């Protein structure tokens, strides 16, 4: 797994999260050629400042952790139609500090409590149904940023779903996600960066979130398409299209201080939104999807009927798929109720 992970990350992101081995080799070569190497040895006699592991490897994702902000700098994933399969259930998962992050630099659940911000995944739980461990690791707070509730459950959720849908059209999809602090221009024309800190650990609330998507149609082909998107950490309605938030990879690299997919010649990449539609789920499809999820977890017939009524109040007629879920879940709940009555 380590060999795969090193190859995996070397082609994903270089910058704040560059490979430790490459850095050590660089410093070694510098020491061998620089005439002041003895001075450097004295300077580093008791060690040089450290910012933690540059890259952290997990079952199904890789990330670089920002010990100052208590959030990830970036989180990298690889998606395919087969890798998305599995039966892992998030009901068994709990948010908790990453055991690999020193206690001094980790966020805690208490930081988010009553903060007004949700715990937003960068590597989504929905991408990690392949194993219980892979899904559980996405709930480490090293993979989490303070995110607006509506954005998390709405637009960002739809963007994550779009990434998964791409695996139906492309053989391989790589995704890099993370937080961003964008400057604001004050009345006097000056640029300033301002962001909230929450909890006793002072977890930084990003002003924006980014996602870079790289898609390959055929493993035997060099044809690749890329799309970079920056969205505000705020509610975004259904009237907005994903293309409104598309930026050039170069501009995102300049703002983030990261270089994405450094092994590629980016000028040779196609635009994802030209190759594909970059179309997120509309209000109707998304409402049906959310209702189906709610029905599958409903614990009473009353709750099941309420979900159906809420959907109809929104003017959306259930499709055949939702009707099947409704009937199946209703039968299960009624059988459970009969069993409890006779025991």
UniProtKB/Swiss-Prot annotation:
User: What coarse category fits the chief subcellular location reported for this protein?
Assistant: mitochondrion
Q: Which GO terms describe its cellular component?
A: mitochondrial inner membrane; nucleus
- What more does the record tell us? The active site contains 1 hydrated divalent metal cation that has only 1 direct interaction with the protein; all other interactions are via water molecules.
**Entry binding sites for a divalent metal cation:** 152
Q: Which gene encodes it?
A: exog
The superkingdom listed in its UniProt entry is Eukaryota
Annotated active site: 121 (proton acceptor)
The name of this protein is: Nuclease EXOG, mitochondrial
Give the EC number: 3.1.30.-
Q: Which cofactor does it need?
A: a divalent metal cation
GO BP annotations of the record are: apoptotic DNA fragmentation
Which keywords has UniProt assigned to this entry?
Endonuclease, Hydrolase, Membrane, Metal-binding, Mitochondrion, Mitochondrion inner membrane, Nuclease, Transit peptide
Subunit composition and interactions: Homodimer.
Per the record, a Pfam family? Exog_C
Q: Which family does it belong to?
A: Belongs to the DNA/RNA non-specific endonuclease family.
Molecular function GO terms recorded: 5'-3' exonuclease activity; metal ion binding; nucleic acid binding; RNA endonuclease activity; single-stranded DNA endodeoxyribonuclease activity
Q: According to its UniProt record, where is this protein located?
A: Mitochondrion inner membrane
Tell me the enzyme class. hydrolase
What InterPro entries does its record include?
DNA/RNA_non-sp_Endonuclease_sf, Endo_G_ENPP1-like_dom, ENPP1-3/EXOG-like_nuc-like, Exog_C, His-Me_finger_sf, Non-specific_endonuclease
Function description: Endo/exonuclease with nicking activity towards supercoiled DNA, a preference for single-stranded DNA and 5'-3' exonuclease activity.
């Amino acid at each position: 797994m380590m060999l795969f992970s090193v190859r995996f990350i070397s082609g994903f992101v270089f910058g704040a999260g560059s490979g430790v081995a490459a850095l050590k080799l660089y410093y070694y070569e510098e020491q061998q050629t620089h005439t002041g190497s003895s001075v450097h040895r004295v300077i580093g006699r008791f060690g040089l400042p450290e910012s933690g592991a540059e890259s952290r490897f997990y079952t199904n994702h890789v990330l670089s952790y920002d010990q100052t902000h208590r959030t990830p700098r970036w989180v990298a994933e690889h998606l395919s139609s087969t890798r998305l399969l599995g039966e892992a259930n998030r009901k068994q998962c709990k948010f908790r500090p990453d055991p690999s992050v020193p206690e001094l630099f980790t966020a805690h659940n208490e930081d988010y409590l009553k903060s007004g911000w949700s715990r937003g995944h960068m590597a989504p739980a929905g991408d990690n149904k392949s194993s219980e461990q892979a899904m559980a690791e996405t709930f480490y707070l090293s993979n989490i940023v303070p995110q607006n509730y509506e954005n998390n459950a709405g637009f960002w959720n739809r963007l994550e779903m779009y990434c998964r849908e791409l695996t139906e059209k492309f053989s391989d999809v790589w995704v890099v996600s993370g937080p961003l602090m964008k400057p604001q221009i004050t009345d006097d024309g000056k640029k300033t960066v301002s962001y909230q800190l929450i909890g006793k650990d002072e977890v930084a609330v990003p002003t924006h979130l980014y996602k870079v998507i790289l898609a390959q149609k055929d493993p035997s082909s060099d044809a690749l398409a890329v799309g970079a998107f920056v969205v505000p950490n705020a509610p975004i309605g259904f009237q907005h299209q994903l293309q409104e938030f598309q930026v050039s990879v170069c501009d995102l690299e300049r703002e983030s201080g990261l270089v994405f997919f450094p092994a590629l010649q980016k000028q040779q990449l196609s635009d994802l939104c030209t190759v594909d539609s970059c179309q997120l789920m509309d209000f109707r499809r998304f409402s049906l999807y959310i209702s189906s999820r709610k029905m599958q977890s409903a614990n009473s017939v009353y709750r099941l009927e309420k979900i159906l009524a809420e959907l109809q109040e929104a003017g959306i007629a259930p499709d055949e798929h939702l009707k099947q879920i409704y009937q199946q879940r209703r039968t299960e709940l009624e059988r459970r109720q009969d069993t409890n009555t006779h025991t």
